[in-house]
């Protein structure tokens, strides 16, 4: 598997759509590595710019540290050569450092630094957290701003100066002014990633703020649609983006919004619909009920044949 310096990884990620695969579980909720590796191989043929193993869509929050390393290692072994694998780090600082080092052992090419777990902190504390993780690894680090870890442009600018391997910023907040200020201040110093749930919804307006890529969960089960949507965004084809939003993305969001936590559950449901089941979600998430699954199946089947499977 090839290795790349941090800024080359960032450039690769900025050049195309990002794959966030689900993590496959058996009925007893143990990790189904053979099924997961088969899925990673299948996704690899569609040409994403990067693969984020065991991320939010991959139920990072329900995996043990040992499982995270196993999942990342499985992805690294299965992706086609040239496709960067990004591993997660999160929770408290000590755990995040441990996970970053585990990512290196597993052969990952970069780190997605998720928010600390269940704690509030000021900007100085958040900055210290990021510095510690960046100092612990030679891999490029992408900072995920969301929930209880929302970074100001001043903090990010200081971190970008202090941490050469801080190479990306993923936005999970949706504050246009904050993103405008960040991009105006840092420009091309970072790669900017759209990270709101069902990021396709916001992809076109975010493109004007320097956000050239985003995390696509639906790439798991409608990869050609996801890539065609991304291409329409990059072309700034407003009519095509609007059509695809109305035909699929927004109705999909309507199902997703029926219950909290469905941003992950609906992706595994989509896998089931296309005949590539990935097993249940782990608690505290819940799977779609039969009626919701039928709604999603009808939506997927209403789309023109795209050769997904």
Curated annotation (Swiss-Prot):
It holds the Pfam family DHDPS. Keywords: Lyase. It catalyses: 5-dehydro-4-deoxy-D-glucarate + H(+) = 2,5-dioxopentanoate + CO2 + H2O. GO terms for molecular function: 4-hydroxy-tetrahydrodipicolinate synthase activity; 5-dehydro-4-deoxyglucarate dehydratase activity. Its EC number is 4.2.1.41. It is an enzyme of class 4 (lyase). GO terms for biological process: D-glucarate catabolic process. Pathway: Carbohydrate acid metabolism; D-glucarate degradation; 2,5-dioxopentanoate from D-glucarate: step 2/2. SMART domains: DHDPS. PANTHER family: 5-DEHYDRO-4-DEOXYGLUCARATE DEHYDRATASE 2-RELATED, DIHYDRODIPICOLINATE SYNTHASE. Belongs to the DapA family. This is Probable 5-dehydro-4-deoxyglucarate dehydratase. It comes from Saccharopolyspora erythraea (strain ATCC 11635 / DSM 40517 / JCM 4748 / NBRC 13426 / NCIMB 8594 / NRRL 2338).
């Amino acid at each position: 598997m090839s290795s790349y310096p941090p800024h080359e990884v960032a450039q690769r990620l900025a050049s195309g759509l990002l794959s966030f695969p689900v993590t496959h579980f058996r009925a007893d909720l143990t990790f189904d590595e053979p099924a997961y590796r088969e899925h990673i191989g299948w996704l690899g043929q569609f040409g994403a710019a990067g693969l984020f193993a065991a991320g939010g869509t991959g139920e990072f929050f329900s995996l043990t540290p040992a499982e995270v390393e196993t999942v990342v290692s499985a992805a690294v072994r299965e992706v086609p050569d040239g496709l960067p694998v990004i591993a997660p780090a999160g929770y408290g600082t000590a755990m995040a450092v441990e996970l970053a080092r585990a990512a290196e052992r597993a052969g990952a090419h970069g780190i997605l630094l998720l928010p600390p777990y269940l704690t509030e902190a000021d900007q100085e504390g958040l900055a210290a957290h990021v510095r510690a993780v960046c100092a612990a690894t030679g891999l490029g680090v992408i900072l995920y701003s969301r929930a209880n870890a929302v970074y100001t442009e001043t903090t990010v600018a200081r971190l970008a100066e202090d941490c050469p391997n801080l190479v990306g910023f993923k936005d999970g907040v949706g504050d246009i002014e904050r993103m405008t200020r960040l991009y105006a201040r840092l420009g091309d110093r970072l790669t900017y990633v759209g990270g709101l749930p069902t990021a396709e919804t916001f992809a076109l307006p975010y493109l004007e703020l320097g956000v050239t890529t985003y995390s696509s969960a639906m790439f798991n089960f409608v990869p050609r649609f996801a890539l065609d949507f991304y291409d329409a965004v990059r072309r700034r084809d407003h009519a095509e983006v609007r059509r695809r939003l109305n035909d699929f993305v927004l109705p999909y969001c309507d199902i997703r919004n029926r219950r909290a936590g469905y941003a992950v559950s609906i992706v595994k449901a989509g896998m089931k619909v296309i005949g590539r089941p990935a097993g249940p979600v782990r608690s505290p998430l819940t799977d779609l009920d039969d009626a919701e699954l039928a709604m999603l199946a009808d939506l997927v089947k209403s789309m023109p044949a795209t050769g997904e499977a």
